[in-house]
């Protein structure tokens, strides 16, 4: 150490002792700008055999317990270098030369674990939840949240991590060493924004030294002085990474990158999951090129600007959302089969609708026309006489056989159509729509397929000149539209006129129970 540095340190020691109480505040404000003094103090700390080390440690402790914020931060900036000196001396087992440093570290620790009234501090950390807006993500949504009873009831549901109360320590041992050092590094990280560049450089350098000493990488880094391994804890390495991450974006890119690689190297050797997770996360978030931030500018960690729109989907998949999606799907299906629902009618006092589909209508028309022609021809031939009675009987038998086959074929086709419609109509498709006559009023849904009159005779008293083939197309829906509802003034559908040798028109009913 040079004589100039020794003179600056001695002047600093004597100045504070003669300083009046009223001048402490102005003295503390100007102290952080004395870069030459700060460099000289670093040189004193780095020489454990220096005679000035003990008075310097005592002076720094007086600064810390003075209660002045500027003096407290002045002492904190030397914490990384003090920790390295203590760990290096502990590794060499020369505990006598580290007594003053150990006393300073213990004094700062015992002052930090209690408040001004002497009670133990309990530090709390709220873990942000991604499902709720916080200052860490989507802070723009916080202002729009209404202060309701529901919001207040969920206020205390966030996960909170507590640190403390911490016991007081009278000496540092192998068991409590890193518990104390981790807490001190936590206090240092809390004041990172007030630390000068020389303190950030010291932090990165001592992190690299602690992690590689005694390992093959020490030869690559060309560190000398300490060749034995320095044990570290997982929590201590996480606190080191916190300071390194801040140094990345505040003018110390190269040193911070080297320190992070060394911490990651040591975490891989120790198989510590916490520092591995944090180091890999920092490494993945770093930009490709070096950050050229000004050392004199504002010190902050660059983060991505919070988006104006929420990144989290508010449409969470729940049982209610699944039910709603199912209802929407069934509602669309109901709209798509409106034509098929016309075929469905309500059972009302034994009434069955005479609706028929267009396909079955055409098939039945063909069969009825054929059968009517055969029957008319048969009656004409009977009145003709007995000249060709034998031939008429044979022709009659053939024609009756053909017409019977055609009628049976038409009936089988219509049965297949009705069966297909019954299978395709599901329970969800028969749900009632609001504002309409509900099918749920009855316990049975009847599908009625009435076939046209086989003889083809027109129906008497047709409404508005409707032909006999169209008279049976009225369904329950069409009757309700025409206000032909059964009630006190009940009107029956026109009854087909009966003729001799005419069978009752076949009617097929299929019942779908709601059970």
Curated annotation (Swiss-Prot):
GO biological process: myelination; phosphatidylinositol phosphate biosynthetic process; protein localization to plasma membrane
Compositional bias ranges of the Polar residues kind: 498-515
Family, similarity comment: Belongs to the Hyccin family.
Ranges of biased composition (kind: Low complexity): 358-378
Cross-referenced InterPro entries: Hyccin
Biased composition range(s): Basic and acidic residues: 389-403
Key words, A-Z: Cell membrane, Cytoplasm, Membrane
Keyword Nucleotide-binding: no
GO CC terms in record: cytosol; plasma membrane
This protein's name: Hyccin
Region annotation Disordered: where it falls in the sequence: 358-410, 491-515
Job description of the protein: Component of a complex required to localize phosphatidylinositol 4-kinase (PI4K) to the plasma membrane. The complex acts as a regulator of phosphatidylinositol 4-phosphate (PtdIns(4)P) synthesis.
Keyword DNA-binding: no
Pfam families: Hyccin (PF09790)
Organism: Gallus gallus (Chicken)
The gene coding this protein: HYCC1
